[in-house]
Design a protein with these regions (language model features):
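Extracellular/surface-exposed low-complexity repeats and stalk/linker segments enriched in Gly/Pro
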Residues: 1-45, 55
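Tryptophan-rich substrate-binding surfaces of secreted polymer-degrading and adhesive proteins
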Residues: 51-59
Length: 59
């Protein structure tokens, strides 16, 4: 289960989030802005969201 640790509304429905979950969890993609952060707790991998591509990019 994905846990949203931080959520800030940027404009309208768009929001910046910092979230954590398992690598098998579906990462959120709707109304998320570039630079949002996701940590896979079971792998230790970190991801940043790319709003233009609509994908999470491993860092």
């Amino acid at each position: 289960m994905v846990r949203i640790l931080t959520e800030r509304v940027i404009e309208g429905n768009d929001k910046y989030i910092e979230a954590a979950g398992l690598s098998t969890d579906s990462k959120p993609t709707e109304n998320i802005v570039t630079g949002s952060v996701f940590l896979e707790v079971n792998t230790g991998k970190g991801f940043l969201f790319n709003e233009t591509a609509g994908t999470w990019v491993e860092q």
